[in-house]
From Swiss-Prot:
GO cellular component: mitochondrial inner membrane; respiratory chain complex III
Keyword rRNA processing: no
Membrane association type: Multi-pass membrane protein
UniProt subcellular location: Mitochondrion inner membrane
Function per UniProt: Component of the ubiquinol-cytochrome c reductase complex (complex III or cytochrome b-c1 complex) that is part of the mitochondrial respiratory chain. The b-c1 complex mediates electron transfer from ubiquinol to cytochrome c. Contributes to the generation of a proton gradient across the mitochondrial membrane that is then used for ATP synthesis.
Cofactor note: Binds 2 heme b groups non-covalently.
Residues noted as binding heme b b562 in the record, renumbered to the chain: 83, 182
Xref: Pfam families: Cytochrom_B_C (PF00032), Cytochrome_B (PF00033)
Name of the molecule in the record: Cytochrome b
């Protein structure tokens, strides 16, 4: 008798995706982040569900409901901090996952890559709206500043902002709708993840060498299930270290002050994972220009596959491109640091230089380096 996992209509899908899936024999730990992102999403949905059982999305009670969760609900503090720091782990894994895609040329799987970009935008939107929910000072002013950016859109801008707010300022209507969107988006993300995997399984995984690996495949289970399990243990350990020892390390102290529309915090800044984009936004003195640069800083990922001039897929054997890639990583870390600094000399100049460098590396220097490498290799 054939094994049920190979015949049952539902189990067959799971079997072909997680058990009998042919996988390249040489994929490194950089291929662990996909499954880690899946784990992050599950942690976020579960902790979020339990938080939603006690949270109230009303401006008068939102802040105190979060306090109530931390003080009075059984292990409420644990659920809340797992959710808040789980978001940080989510973004660490996301950026590593995208970085892996750029380094090893995985972006040549166009459908998978484009769904991935949509997923990135969806996760960023979800995280932004989630940050508004505790209704602290940074929640309120972050929501005000970021939604206000849409007013830079010519002609319809102001109307659009007031439509999103549901009034003439960030208020009860805004908080309620943000909670509704924050609740529904993770399930949309989960559906998109299915599509992401569907497209990935059409082609199979890439590998560090960038060379087709059809002649050398191994079953996903047990080899990569055990490897993923190790990744899970390491990430959960890191998350628990953060949650149990310094849960507020990555947060903003201003968010422990209830939202007050009459009192603006001295430095309005988003969570650490948005600081690089925030620095790019601030580096341009013009409002519309800044907004366009902000959107382009992420949307530029969609252009990367069309700028691939190398005859090789991966950067594994391309030292010039490798150097540029790591300069890009250092540049993003610089932008992250600048995003958290006040708008004054020398930070303004550093931010502008780093922003120009970010776009230059991706749009000009990397394609040029690839052409030079082709020439050196006489291709």
């Amino acid at each position: 008798m054939t094994n049920i996992r190979k015949t049952h209509p539902l189990l067959k899908i799971i079997n072909h995706s997680l058990i009998d899936l042919p996988a390249p024999s040489n994929i490194s730990a950089w291929w662990n982040f996909g499954s880690l992102l899946g784990l992050c999403l599950m942690i976020q949905i579960l902790t979020g569900l339990f938080l939603a059982m006690h949270y109230t999305s009303d401006t008068t009670t939102a802040f105190s409901s979060v306090t109530h969760i931390c003080r009075d609900v059984n292990y409420g503090w644990l659920i809340r901090y797992l959710h808040a720091n789980g978001a940080s782990m989510f973004f660490i894994c996301l950026y590593m996952h995208v970085g892996r895609g750029i380094y090893y040329g995985s972006y040549t799987y166009l459908e998978t890559w484009n769904i991935g970009i949509i997923l990135l935008f969806a996760v960023m939107a979800t995280a932004f709206m989630g940050y508004v929910l505790p209704w602290g000072q940074m929640s309120f002013w972050g929501a005000t500043v970021i939604t206000n950016l849409l007013s830079a859109i010519p002609y319809i801008g102001t109307t659009l902002v007031e439509w999103i707010w549901g009034g003439f300022s960030v208020d009860k209507a805004t908080l309620t709708r943000f909670f509704a969107f924050h609740f529904i988006l993770p399930f949309i993300i989960a559906a998109l993840v299915m599509v992401h995997l569907l497209f990935l399984h059409e082609t199979g995984s890439n590998n560090p060498s960038g060379i087709p690996s059809d002649s050398d495949k191994i079953p996903f289970h047990p080899y990569y299930t055990i490897k993923d399990a190790l990744g899970f243990i390491m990430m959960i350990l890191l998350l628990l270290l953060l949650v149990l020892f310094s849960p507020d390390l990555l947060g903003d102290p201003d968010n422990y002050t209830p939202a007050n529309p009459l009192n603006t915090p001295p430095h309005i800044k988003p969570e650490w994972y948005f600081l690089f984009a925030y620095a790019i936004l601030r580096s341009i003195p013009n409002k519309l220009g800044g907004v366009l640069a902000l959107v382009m800083s992420i949307l530029i990922l969609a252009i990367i596959p069309f700028l691939h001039t190398s005859k090789q897929r991966s950067m594994m054997f391309r030292p010039l491109s490798q150097i540029l890639f790591w300069i890009l990583v250092a540049d993003l870390l610089t932008l992250t640091w600048i995003g958290g600094q006040p708008v004054e000399h020398p930070f303004i100049t550093i931010g502008q230089v780093a922003s120009i460098l970010y776009f230059s590396i991706i749009l000009v220097l990397m394609p040029l380096a690839s052409l030079i490498e082709n020439k050196i290799l006489k291709w």
